[in-house]
Design a protein with these regions (language model features):
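Bacterial N-terminal signal peptides
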Residues: 8-18
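Pepsin/retropepsin-fold aspartyl endopeptidases
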Residues: 21-414
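Positively charged n-region of N-terminal signal peptides that target proteins for export
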Residues: 1-5
């Protein structure tokens, strides 16, 4: 199941490298990117594919496509294409740059792209600097293929209206934008948007101030390891689970899943959220320059408008606002392999969990879940299936070519 929080942070650092590489190749200052709205001062209302809280939009590259791009505030720089797609399209690539910086420490290759033409329904950009990364490395952990990421290029010049409930996105010209209903939350934009929030801990009436990156490309809200350690966040959580929490293009990330009493944004109070307390000692989640990440599992509870030029975010509660925060109750971290993501395998088993008690191991392939073929689940339905406390789940797995039966009883782990 997908906890790919570090991908976008790695990408943010990668884009900095790409920008430096492009500047070295051409000392001229690039002209500001100007979006062209095909009809008036706004794009079409774009039907978004919101899968596991992550927003996928149709994007054309040089008139070809559309391809599936993640709309990602965590990508504060230029768009990112999957390297295989860029090569298939014959896009000219610059000099290879090995990078690290997110989850894990294994270098991967970035290639700068001097310019691309990008378009979405009702909106076009010409000659946009971009970069490639091997985004397909993340596909098994996301349970879905992505062709690219688009973020700061659009957010910096267009008002972005995201209606999670209706699964739509619309971009507007800041000059003609009329503010929507909802609470205005000030943001500070440093490539990515940041908010100042109050974090209330269990057992304390005094909040902790937190400077959080707002990231639509991350599911679970995460606190960086220095912030978690300084404020003893793990100790205050009523229950917690130490486990693998992320897998970025540079490798795995580790942390402790737990809860805080509440997070406040302006006058909006979000009760008892599930959060990740990072224990990383290297990479972006070990940074003390910001407290952590406000993820999409919180954002999906609102109609969200990002107004970078106006330094504000507008939040209007939707029907999901009061829904409880839940987390996996099995102890399994799964990956989906194969062209259609139909092969479900165990990637990691957390200690002292139902999955460990049932004898499940990394590498096991799950064939059936309560008699139903595992391939008939998608990421969202499978996650929901493992989030019901007290449910007994019978699995048929294959290990070393041999079928094995396993039974586990789900329990609330955080």
């Amino acid at each position: 199941m997908k906890f790919a929080k570090c991908l976008t942070l790695t990408v943010a650092l990668a884009i900095a490298f790409a920008a430096a590489a492009l500047q070295a190749q051409d000392q001229r200052q690039p002209a500001p990117l100007v979006p062209k709205f095909v009809k008036g001062s706004a794009s079409d209302v774009i039907a978004a594919d919101i899968f596991d809280t992550i927003i996928y939009l149709p994007v054309k590259i040089g008139g070809q496509g559309p391809y599936s791009f993640v709309l990602d505030t965590g990508n504060g720089g230029t768009p990112v294409l999957d390297e295989k797609l860029a090569r298939a399209l014959g896009v000219p690539l610059g000099t290879r740059i090995p990078i690290t910086g997110g989850a894990g420490s294994t270098p991967v290759d970035l290639y700068p792209i001097e310019k691309l033409d990008l378009s979405m329904p009702g909106l076009t950009f010409s000659e946009v600097p971009a970069a490639t990364l091997p985004l397909d490395l993340m596909d098994p952990h996301w349970g879905k293929h992505k062709d690219g990421l688009v973020g700061g290029t659009v957010f910096s010049v267009a008002i972005t209206d995201i209606d999670y409930a209706k699964k739509t996105v619309r971009f507007s010209d800041p000059k003609t934008f009329t503010p929507a209903a909802g609470e205005v939350i000030p943001i500070e934009v440093f490539g990515q948007p940041f908010v100042r929030a109050k974090v209330f801990l269990h057992g304390s009436s005094q909040p902790v101030e937190a400077f959080l990156m707002v990231d639509t490309g991350v599911r679970v809200t995460t606190f960086n390891s220095p912030f978690s350690k300084t404020n003893k966040l793990v100790e205050q959580s009523p229950k917690s689970l130490a486990t693998m929490t992320g897998f970025g293009i540079n490798g795995a990330s580790w942390g402790t899943i737990g809860r805080v009493q509440a997070i406040e944004l302006g006058s909006i109070r979000i009760e008892n959220p599930v959060v990740d307390f990072s224990t990383d000692t290297a990479g972006a989640l070990s940074s003390d320059r910001f407290a952590g990440i406000l993820g999409a599992d919180m954002l999906r509870r609102f109609h969200v408008v990002f107004d970078y030029p106006g330094q504000r975010m507008i939040l209007e509660k939707n029907a999901e606002f009061g829904a409880p925060f839940e987390f996996d109750m099995s102890g399994l971290r799964l990956v989906a392999e194969g062209k259609d993501f139909s092969r479900i395998k165990v990637f990691h088993v957390a200690d002292k969990t139902p999955a460990q008690a049932a004898g499940l191991q990394a590498g096991d392939e799950i064939r059936t879940v309560d008699g139903r073929k595992a391939s008939t689940f998608n990421w969202e339905t499978l996650r929901a299936y493992f989030q019901r406390p007290g449910r007994t789940v019978k699995l048929e797995i294959v290990r070393d070519g041999k079928p094995i039966a396993a039974t586990l009883t789900l329990e609330r782990l955080v």
